[in-house]
Every structure is written in structure tokens, then in C-alpha cells.
Amino acid sequence: MPIALDAMGGDHAPDEIVAGAVQAVREHGIPVVLVGAARPLQDALSLHGATTEIPIIRAEEALAMDEGALASLRRPRSSIAVACHLVRRGDACAVVSAGSTAGVVATGKLRLRGQPGVLRPAIAVVLPTLPTPTILLDAGANAEVKPEMLVQFAHLGAAYAEAALEIDHPRIGLLTIGSEPEKGNKLVKRAHELLSAAPGLDFAGNIEGHDLLTGAVNVIVTDGFTGNVALKTMEGSVRYAFAELREVIKESRTARLGGLLQRKQLRELHRRLDPDVHGGAVLLGLNGTVVIAHGASQAKGVSAACVLAATLARQGVVARIGERLAASHRPHRLW
């Protein structure tokens, strides 16, 4: 079953989106259908000689990158809406979009609906920690949450870690301002109490910002506001560190020689930290697989997002989440 790729979402749509689709098909053998305006997609496919390899599902409307949830309601035939409809109808196994995060989240909730018992869907990102990756959620879907939602995010993240990362009994950490149980605001304190008593979760307690990349836990739970700020801070820190490193290497012949000798290792480090390599974030808690690629994704990032989506669909992450939620206490739906 193909990936439904929103070809009109992203800073570099549709050209880089189409190029990424071609990479996914030719290099990874992943079937893709492009969803968007027919004429520009046909023109872009012809540049790659791929007009017969990748089908197009027509959707002449698109959400702009600065448009949010309300715009998704006003455009029921937008490319992201049609892509979600394909998954709901069973004609595609997953949705991939580099479009507006708010628009993708709102459209996903409207078109795919939440899994039984889900309070809110959450955006999960995989951090390149050692020895195993760490999942951070929520990374931006819900700026305001209730304590019960953080418990459910822990279940979503645990199911993702088990299915996608093959981690048995993932350890859960709650992001706050101190390791002691009493540290944090009312939301965090109550969430700590609930997580400590939640069956089926290996809750390791509170973690602080400096623990984000240490691999101390397998799943980090927080609200979407804090999670998004943390994620963007890490991305900016990585860019700053590499910029400083380039300047330091230029300072002397010895430094330049050292840079040349370590070039292979530096490239590997850059690859590990490159968002394009990891494919994007995953919107968990819906009746379908949704991958949100970085808005500035080039072809490589789009292709990686398609690979991630196909992998998650094949591993049955949505079903695994449903099983885990069914085994836990089901709260009432809030949306």
C-alpha cells in the first residue's frame, strides 16, 4: 500500500517534495502517491523522468505554511485533507507532510479521528541519544494539557518505543525543573503522582533539561509548549556548535589539519544530528500513521520521512498503541 505524500506542503513544495518521492520509490522501493495540484506535479515528475512511476491524486487547494487549524476547516479539499482521506479509506498506509504543523494536526484529528480513549494526539520526535534513541513528546501539538494527558502521552511514547525502536519496558521520564518529585508547577506535580501510580508504565521520575540527550530514559513526556521550545533549542544549539567548530578549525594550520584528520568522524556526527536523516516527527494517537517532516525539508528529508512512515505502518504502531491503551484505564474523550 502506498504512502500518501502531501506534495503541496513545505517551504520547498512541490519541487523538493517530488524529488523526495522519486528517491523513496527508486532508492528504497517505497510506493508513493503524490497529492496536490496536477499540473505542477506533472511538470516536476517529468524533470525526473518519473511520470509513469508515481501516480497523482488531484487536490488543487493547499494550506500555506503560516496557516493553522482554522484554515484546515475551511479547505476540506486541501492536499493534506485528501491525503488523510486516502488513509482513512484504506487506499494508503500513511500520510507524510512537510506542511504547517498546526494544519496537519488539525486535519489529522478531523479526518482520521483519535483512537478509542485518546484524549489528545501528541507529536513524538526521536532524539539521537546513545546508546539508544530517546522519544520526546509532546513536541508541539498541545500547548496546554491536563495531567491525565501526560500519562497518556507516556503510553503513546512507550508503544512507539516498543514497536519502532524495539525497546522492552521503556523507561519514562517527566521533564521539569528538578529531579525531586515536588519540583515543578501544579501540572507537573499532579502528573508525577499519576505516572507513579500508573499500571504498565516504568516511570523513572523527573528529569531536567540537561538530561534530554543523555539517554537516561527512553521516553520523555512534557506538554507541547515546553517540548517544542526544548526541541528548537536543541536544533539551534547543534547549528551553533557546528558553526563555532568551523570557525575554530580556521584559526590555525594545526586546527585545520586536525579538522581534516577528523573529517570522516565530523561528517558522521553531522549525519546523526541532521533532522533530514531521521525523517521527521510522528503524530501519535490517531487512526492512521501520520509523519510530519521538517518544513524546510529537501528531497533527502522527504524521502526519509516516507521511509519512516512505511516502517511505522509495517510495524503496526497504530495497533500497538490501541492495544496498550486498551490495557490501561480508559479516560473520557475531551475532544
Mark where each language-model region is.
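Glycine-rich phosphate/nucleotide-binding loop
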Residues: K109-L136, A216-I220, G224-W335
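N-terminal phosphate-binding or glycine-rich loops at protein starts, especially the Walker A/P-loop
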Residues: M1-L41
